[in-house]
Amino acid sequence: LYGDSSKGVFEIALAEWYYQNNDSFHALLLVTGTIPMMENMQDMQCLFVAMALQMKILLLNGQMQAAEPLVEKIRERIKRTGWEELTSSLNALGAWAACYDGKQEIVEEWLHTNAPDENKELYMMDMYAYLVKIRCYLLIGKYMLALILAKQLIHILEKGQRFMDLCECYMLSAFACCKAGSMDDMCDELEKALRIAKKYNYIRLLADEGAYMVRMLVAYQKKRGADTFTDEILILAGEVGKRLPNYMKSPDEYYEPLTATEKKILQFMAQGLSYQEIAEKTDKKIGTVKFHSSGIFKKLQVRNRQQAVNRAGESGLL
């Protein structure tokens, strides 16, 4: 079926198996040895998968500086061999890495310029890019769009029995529910992902979600109970969260949450109202308004009203 590439295909699949079973060292050893073979054969599809896995292993083990240049290295190979159809997946790979590094500007640029349009006919070759797009929606706070796209893909993946992608979709659907504060729905979606992950031993698929997987699993275990499988993922996800603390943090999550009163005062600030006018609107003394304003400045890490309004606009608080 795969001809001369069969050995490389097998070794890449085996490397993924090692990785999912939390053996990053042997996965990296195997996939790194396969890359020169794929380059010699100019098999860009297999080469892309191999280099993307290599990049993932490096990034998730805290080697961000070594991982980032791989995107341009793959891009150079694509240009040289003419496999332009892989460009969509490559651009998505860069956006995926930006999610882990907390680089929202790169994520937003990819969404606006290169991300596939899920409102058109879904193209299976873009499945990787669709999965990345769900993550990007989650990062910028568009939870409903993330959930809609995940449900679209789940319908297709169930029919095609693509269990690894299906597991990821259920997990991302749980992610969207968690971000939206719907924890019962989160547990339902996460349970579906866990059922598949446990059957096929997709340990890293879930653990690589880091701090948010920890948050989801803690809530899940309180409601549905714990077992050795979820405990193992919880430990590994905690390690990822420590190495990559900014992964999937929405802009507002970088700052201490504002109280309801502080949010209301901040909105009046954005309208250009004076402290006197805000005091009248909120039926509070000027001193009280100024006290709450100081709390806003401290939480948003700014020094004055204009900076607070600007920061709130950047982080989606207004």
Regions picked out by a protein language model, each given a short descriptive name:
Residues 31, 71, 78, 108-112, ...:
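Inward-facing hydrophobic residues that define packing positions of alpha-helical scaffold repeats
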Residues 245-294, 298-299, 307-318:
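Helix-turn-helix DNA-binding segment
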Residues 132-139, 148, 175, 179, ...:
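Linker/hinge segments immediately adjacent to helix-turn-helix/homeobox DNA-binding domains
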Residues 1-13, 38-53, 65, 78-94, ...:
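Alpha-solenoid helical repeat architecture
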Residues 14, 54, 94, 133, ...:
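Structural register within alpha-helical repeat arrays
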